[in-house]
Amino acid sequence: PVLTGAEFARGVNLRNGVDTYSASDISNLETSGGTNWQDYFFRSAPFSNINISASGGSEDVDYYLSANSYKADGTIVDQDYSRMNLRANINAQLSEKLKVGVNNFISRSQNNGVRANIATGMAWDISQTPLDASGNDNSSPVYSGVGNGTPQPLLAPKYNSRENISDQLISSIYANYELTDNLVLNISAGLEKIDLTNSGYVSSLVNGTSEATVRDQQ
């Protein structure tokens, strides 16, 4: 943060023209520094990326198989992304004149977590804390000109949910038939299919009322 907690409080008082923060509040902020909401919003984001493959065959048949798994946490709390890919290619010389092949690709990706209102969080009341004195989530809106009536900014990423799933299938086949030494008949066909599923939930703690949504798209 550019300002200390006490400096922020004095700036709010100056802007509002009233003592939004009392002298006691400012004294406490001098000691504690206040809540740095960035420490709660942001985190280290480890990821893993694993690739495996195999290939081989014989004089008449060859194959290639591969798989990829990617997982990553978001730099914002309660967000993550994952993806899994599988690929299989097979070619076969069935006779002196006929060669066929199949290529398949399957993928699923999943994105979890709601968008966090970082701008609101950075300007929220630094004298407040994520938890109240009883250890429960601090869910009381602040109307002092600091929180602008918005709920505690960590409630949305914690209690709201959003899940976006994308499934993709790409498949193709081909056949080559040698009609003559100088003429080859090539036949191919392919299929591509994408399914999208978007679901979400908004908690009453954040929006006053609960709401759930599910949308499918192909």
Regions found by a protein language model. Give the residues of each.
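Residues that act as N-cap/strand-start positions at coil-to-secondary-structure junctions
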Residues: 46-48, 84
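Residues on the lipid-exposed face of transmembrane beta-strands in outer-membrane beta-barrel proteins
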Residues: 52-56, 86-92, 171-177
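Surface-exposed loop/interface segments of Gram-negative outer-membrane beta-barrel transport/assembly proteins
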Residues: 1-34, 74-81, 85-170, 186-218
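Extended, loop-rich substrate-binding clefts of extracytoplasmic carbohydrate-active enzymes
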Residues: 62
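Outer-membrane beta-barrel initiation region
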Residues: 40-45, 54-58
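Ligand-site clamp/hinge motif
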Residues: 70-72
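Outer-membrane beta-barrel channels and translocator barrels
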Residues: 47, 58-59, 95, 178-180
